[in-house]
């Protein structure tokens, strides 16, 4: 579901002259991050967790990153990644899973990840899945990634391979496997 379309971003109009106050809260975390921009398209979809609980996949990206082979699929990737890891390992603990297009290669925080705004297709799937995989390793298991980096990246890369094989009937798995040869 598109919450804020490219047309609304480009119109640069406000529906109200009054200020709004947004309050953010996240429980059981050791870190946090947030992002905002009047240039973001906002897209969202329901995440179905194994227990029957729901979460919300949200993507925030600029008009320049839009496109069916680019960030227009970010919410699909986020939803698939969270649902897979929740089914395979442990249920996702946060009410939202947000993927923000930024200028970094990829960075994870509880409930939110940042992926490069120019990522597309297999690259966007890979970085999205990898950064959300960090919710499980190291965040949920509680390991110290600065002391045990091999656990952080090693376990995460392992679960990423399984997730990529399962995503959309292996849409990106074959391409990824061929690149390793």
Q: What does each model-identified segment do?
A:
Residues 1-129, 158:
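Hydrophobic helix-coil surface modules that form long, contiguous segments used
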Residues 15-19, 176-181:
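Residue-level recognition of alpha-helix boundary/capping or hinge positions
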Residues 72, 114-179:
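Zinc-dependent metallopeptidase catalytic helix centered on the HExxH motif
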